[in-house]
């Protein structure tokens, strides 16, 4: 087991921060046509990222000084496809949430072999391991049964998009999850369906897929961190691979993070999760990740 100490100087994460998304990898074992991560540009399974090794992630993440109540959220892609995820979970000193589709390689035995599950033990108004069901890609009954096996020692639940095309399927999932004693929640569908726009957007014209304003000031309370350790201003920058606009790298000894307005020339290519009105990490409604000033 590696030491949780780091040789890098500490980095204070601004108090206003609501979320740190750690993209261990952009690889995924599913191929969903509706993947929100490929909203404007292909991000999933694009071979353009060097992935940090487990030892690098441990060094980088342990230097962070997080605001009270804010965990690290491992995501992707599929975070369990990173070969070092089990080593990371054993050695990172912070609480950790995981967004996963629960690939077949993730088993009860692998979790039981971990030297600690302390990373999973935090007070939270929602499951800290959030398993997503992807319609057309896997069997929700088998997924629920696997989650049920993990529930005795993990804070874990099932999530699915509340898509208007198949409310009957969502109700079936809800009933089966309740029958099996598994927590099931839906997430708001983002986008347009049969001429109707779903979700509430603070900036309704922000997600059209092309820049429509070249001089806005944007401040984000979310830090998306790419597989190579680069910290991006927003999800649009990450998915668009705008490395030249990154705020820095987690392994940079001189890294400093500031919560401030920054110039942006890409308004109109925003990702819905950054501009929608939603709940914050305390599940308080009315929060939006970004605040944008227009000239």
Whereabouts are the PLM-identified features?
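Ankyrin repeat (ANK) tandem alpha-helical domains that serve as protein-protein interaction scaffolds
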Residues: 43, 52-63, 87, 175, ...
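Generic structural signal for well-ordered alpha-helices
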Residues: 58-61, 86-89, 108-115, 143-148, ...
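Short catalytic/ligand-binding loop motif for oxyanion handling, primarily in non-cytosolic enzymes
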Residues: 31, 41-44, 81-83, 106-107, ...
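Canonical Radical SAM [4Fe-4S] cluster-binding loop centered on the CxxxCxxC motif
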Residues: 8-56, 67, 235, 241, ...
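Residues immediately within or flanking Cys/His clusters that coordinate Zn2+
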Residues: 25, 29, 215, 267
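Flexible mid-to-C-terminal extensions adjoining Fe-S/redox cofactors in radical SAM and related proteins
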Residues: 1-18, 38, 237-295
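Radical SAM enzyme [4Fe-4S]-AdoMet core and its adjacent flexible, acidic
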Residues: 128-248, 252-255
């Amino acid at each position: 087991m590696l030491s949780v100490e780091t040789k890098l100087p500490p980095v204070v994460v601004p108090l206003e921060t609501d979320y740190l998304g750690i993209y261990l990898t952009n690889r995924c074992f599913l191929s969903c046509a509706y993947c929100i991560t490929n909203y404007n540009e292909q991000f999933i399974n694009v071979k353009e990222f060097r992935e940090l090794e487990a030892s690098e992630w441990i060094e980088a993440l342990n230097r962070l000084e997080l605001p009270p109540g804010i965990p690290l959220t491992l995501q992707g892609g599929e975070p369990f496809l990173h070969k070092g995820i089990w080593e990371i979970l054993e050695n990172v000193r912070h609480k950790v949430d995981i967004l996963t589709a629960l690939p077949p390689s993730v088993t009860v035995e692998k979790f039981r072999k971990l030297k600690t599950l302390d990373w999973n033990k935090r007070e939270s108004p929602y499951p800290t391991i959030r398993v997503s069901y992807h319609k057309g890609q896997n069997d929700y009954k088998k997924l629920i049964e696997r989650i049920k096996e993990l529930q005795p020692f993990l804070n874990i639940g099932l999530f699915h998009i509340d898509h208007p095309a198949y409310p009957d399927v969502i109700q079936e999932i809800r009933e089966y999850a309740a029958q099996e004693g598994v927590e099931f929640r839906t997430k708001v569908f983002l986008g347009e369906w049969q001429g109707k726009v779903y979700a509430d957007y603070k900036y309704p014209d922000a997600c059209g897929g092309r820049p429509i304003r070249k001089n806005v000031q944007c401040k984000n309370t979310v830090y998306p961190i790419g597989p190579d350790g680069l910290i991006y201003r927003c999800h649009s920058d990450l998915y668009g691979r705008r490395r030249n606009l990154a705020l820095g790298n987690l392994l940079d000894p001189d890294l400093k993070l500031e919560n401030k307005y920054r110039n942006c020339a890409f308004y109109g290519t925003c990702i819905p999760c950054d501009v929608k009105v939603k709940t914050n990490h305390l599940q308080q409604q009315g929060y939006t990740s970004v605040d944008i000033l227009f000239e």
